[in-house]
A protein has these predicted regions:
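Juxtamembrane inter-helical linkers in multi-pass membrane proteins
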Residues: 59-69, 74, 212, 220-223, ...
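Juxtamembrane helix-boundary/capping and inter-helix hinge elements in multi-pass membrane proteins
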Residues: 122-125, 204-209, 219-222, 260-263, ...
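Transmembrane helix boundary and interhelical loop/hinge segments in multi-pass membrane proteins
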Residues: 72-73, 199-212, 221, 234, ...
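Glycine-rich helix-loop "coupling/hinge" segments at transmembrane-helix boundaries
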Residues: 65-66, 154, 252-277, 363-369, ...
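Membrane-water interface segments at the C-terminal ends of transmembrane alpha-helices
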Residues: 26-65, 84-204, 232-252, 257, ...
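Transmembrane alpha-helical segments of polytopic membrane transport and secretion proteins
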Residues: 1-34, 302-340, 431, 592-605
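A short amphipathic helical element positioned immediately N-terminal to and/or at the very start
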Residues: 15-20, 72-85, 369-388
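Alpha-helical residues within the helix-turn-helix
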Residues: 215, 273, 506
């Protein structure tokens, strides 16, 4: 009996040892489990927390009402939707958000379609360069266009230096300087490159044989576009429409900069105001509404794309599309395209740069130009150091590089690990769970996701300390927000590498980490670099995601520019935005160099 028990114990330990050795040799399952645990906490827990906050009594309200902290309540839902202040904090901002989103999306979609058609399909002058130049506004921080507009059209309604037009004796009316009109225009000019890229890509993929056949049967250009090309662009048009609406609804900078002076509130700025007033229950409800709107728009987009997948063109690729000759319209259309570039990309840079180089607005004498706002020497009416010597700017610059850099590296590595687990564990629950949960942050606008993180990490929960006010929280929220892009990139990259190289390494006795570092890492080097640089670019110009999470000492360049604007230091804000623009441009050039392509490759020329 004793021998039998001893033998069974030995066989158990031998079996356990074999399983552990297999797990160490091929720990894909273990990696998948660890990723499931980490992402469950970083993605699902904040969402659960914000839903909980929307129906839980806060400590302050509990003290005022005689209830218990955390007690179930519909108070905040009622406050947002039916109370005496609901018009101010929700219904009017919702109406304003819909109005601005409608006009901004309409302008962006129209500009994107027209310019994409001109660059990809016509002999417009400079089409080779316009393909890249027209997407520059997409690389700039969201507040660049708004601050440039403010610098140009600002009037005496708000304090600070004169606007450029006002310095020439022209006082812009309030409706032109602030409110729905400038917000809609600035949003449209910021987001039309998104439409331009999608339409350009769609147009380049349309089989040219369809147009050739129509031309053979005598169809005119107008008929070809109305009967063939535009119907084929319907899925792209719907995607542009829905995704642009989602982006405009979640944008904070432009409504804050141009809406606050006119007391024109959108949902994003109403959410921010609730955060500043420490009304966490209302914050939770508004954030949930924004998230549900984003989810609804995305589901509609998916439905439209799937529906229109039935209408595909079948056949070989025709000859390369030859640019249509515009004839007498070539010069007018060329002027139009270059004017859009001037207004949307070059214009803001010029306005921002001029404002930082002129000691007095509107004085174009040579003696008025200099680096006073950059050095802080002989600056009229400003008690702040210059950009080069400002402790706030230097700290914000360091924080931006530290936070965006750390987040991008973690995001890139995490994306490849998710890709590895998903591809190497096909058909498993772990694979399906990781694929879906890593995409979940895409459904939430930046402000709403930041509010979710604020609700989760504002206080200590078990072994996890309170992270609010720390750089760690900003890094975490950036990592999780950009994870959908990194994970999709990682999955795509890993699907291109079969298991054979790893199996060969195992035969030669290489351990798991040796196979990762010596086999997979070199094969995925380019994918990893791209997965790091793209989140870094986005992180450097991020504002909506971090504006409610930063505290003194953790300011980024984007939030510091907003602080300067709040205190009336327009020139310092503009200089800070220029620094962001330069860093982003350099990062894009590095990305182009690494990938040996560019964001507008194939669009023209």
């Amino acid at each position: 009996m004793f021998t039998s028990n001893s033998t069974s114990q030995n066989s158990f330990f031998v079996s356990l040892k074999i399983k552990l050795s297999k797990l160490l040799l091929q720990p894909t399952f273990l990696i998948g489990v660890v990723l499931v645990i980490i992402l469950s906490y970083l993605v699902i827990a904040p969402i659960v927390s914000i839903f909980s906050n929307s129906v839980s009594l806060t400590m302050m309200d509990a003290m005022l009402s005689g209830g218990k902290d955390g007690e179930f309540t519909y108070k905040y839902v009622d406050r947002v939707f039916t109370s005496s202040i609901s018009e101010k904090i929700f219904w009017i901002p919702l109406k304003n958000s819909i109005t601005v989103s409608f006009f901004a999306t309409l302008i962006a979609l129209t500009l994107g379609l027209i310019l994409a058609s001109l660059v990809t399909s016509t002999n417009i002058l400079g089409r080779k360069y316009l393909g890249f130049l027209l997407i520059i506004p997409y690389m700039l921080p969201s507040q660049a266009m708004a601050t440039a507009w403010l610098t140009m059209f600002k009037n005496r309604k708000i304090s600070g230096p004169q606007g450029m037009l006002e310095s020439f004796g022209i006082t812009p009316p309030d409706w032109l300087a602030y409110g729905p009109l400038p917000i809609s225009i600035c949003m449209a000019l910021s987001y039309f490159p998104f439409a331009f890229l999608l339409f350009s890509s769609a147009l380049s993929k349309i089989d040219i044989q369809l147009e050739e056949v129509a031309s053979t049967f005598g169809a005119k250009t107008k008929a070809i576009w109305s009967k063939i090309i535009l119907p084929l662009l319907i899925p792209t048009t719907m995607s542009v429409l829905l995704l642009t609406v989602a982006r405009t609804l979640g944008t904070f900078a432009t409504p804050y900069i141009l809406g606050t002076p006119a007391k024109y509130t959108l949902l994003s700025t109403s959410l921010y105001s609730s955060v500043r007033s420490n009304d966490s229950g209302v914050v939770a409800v508004i954030a949930i509404v924004l998230s549900l709107i984003g989810l609804m728009l995305l589901l509609v987009d998916i439905w439209v794309v799937r529906k229109w997948q039935r209408f595909v063109t079948v056949g070989g690729k025709g000859i390369k599309r030859q640019p249509s000759k515009l004839g007498v319209f070539r010069m007018p259309t060329t002027i139009f395209a270059w004017i859009i570039f001037l207004i949307a990309a070059l214009g803001p840079f010029i306005v921002l740069a001029l404002s930082t180089l002129m000691r007095e607005p509107g004085n174009f004498s040579f003696s008025n130009f200099g680096l006073a706002y950059w050095t802080g020497v002989n600056v009229p009416g400003m008690d702040q150091p210059g950009i080069f010597t400002s402790p706030e700017v230097i700290t914000a610059l360091k924080n931006s590089f530290l936070i965006a850099g750390s987040a991008s590296i973690i995001c890139g590595v995490l994306g490849l690990l998710i890709g590895y687990a998903v591809v190497r564990l096909p058909g498993t629950l772990i694979s399906g769970f990781l694929r879906q949960i890593s995409f979940l942050p895409y459904l939430m606008p930046g402000l709403a996701f930041a509010a979710a993180y604020l609700s989760l990490f504002a206080v200590a929960r078990g072994p996890i300390p309170a992270l609010y006010g720390s750089i760690s929280l900003l890094i975490l929220v950036m990592v999780v927000t950009y994870l959908p892009y990194a994970s999709r990139s990682g999955i795509s990259a890993m699907m291109q590498v079969g298991p054979e190289p790893e199996e060969a390494g195992m035969v030669l006795g290489a351990g798991f980490w040796r196979r990762i570092t010596s086999i997979l890492a070199p094969l995925q080097k380019s994918a990893l670099i791209i997965a790091i640089i793209l989140p870094f670019i986005t992180g450097m110009k991020e504002l909506s995601l971090v504006v409610m999470l930063v505290t003194p000492g953790t300011e980024l360049l984007t939030t510091q520019s907003i602080r300067f604007l709040d205190f009336g230091y327009t020139q310092l804000a503009n200089a800070t935005i220029l620094i962001i623009g330069v860093v982003v441009m350099i990062s894009v050039l590095i990305l182009n160099r690494v990938t040996k392509t560019n964001l507008a490759s194939g669009l023209g020329g």
